[in-house]
Regions:
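Ribonuclease/tRNase effector modules and their secretory precursors
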Residues: 1-95
Length: 95
C-alpha cells in the first residue's frame, strides 16, 4: 500500500490529543515508518475501506492508527490513533 498524502480532519486531531494523548505528528510517523497494515472493515461506499496501521513513532512509542485509504489519490485519512493494546503489541513483536 503506497501512501503519498496523509490527511487528518481538525475534529479528529482534537479527539486524538484530548482522548488518546496522541499527536497528529506521531500518527504520521507511524504511517510513514513502514507500519504493519491490516484491513479492518469494508466501507459503506467503494473506496472507503478502513485499515489499521501498527508501528512505532521515532521516539519509540507503539501506536495503532486507523485510517481510510483512498487508492486513487494514495491518501490516508486518519480516523483514530491510540496506544497499542497488549494483544496488538504482542502480535506486532512477531513481525
Amino acid at each position: 500500500m503506497k501512501i503519498d498524502f496523509i490527511v487528518c480532519p481538525e475534529s479528529i486531531e482534537y479527539k486524538l490529543e484530548s482522548k488518546h494523548s496522541v499527536t497528529v505528528r506521531e500518527a504520521r510517523q507511524v504511517l510513514l515508518n513502514n507500519p504493519r497494515i491490516r484491513f479492518v472493515e469494508k466501507g459503506y461506499t467503494k473506496g472507503n475501506d478502513l485499515y489499521g496501521a501498527f508501528g512505532q513513532t521515532l521516539a519509540g512509542r507503539y501506536l495503532s492508527v486507523f485510517f481510510v485509504y483512498k487508492p486513487e489519490m494514495a491518501t490516508a485519512i486518519i480516523i483514530s490513533a491510540r496506544n497499542m493494546s497488549k494483544k496488538e503489541r504482542k502480535s506486532y513483536g512477531k513481525k
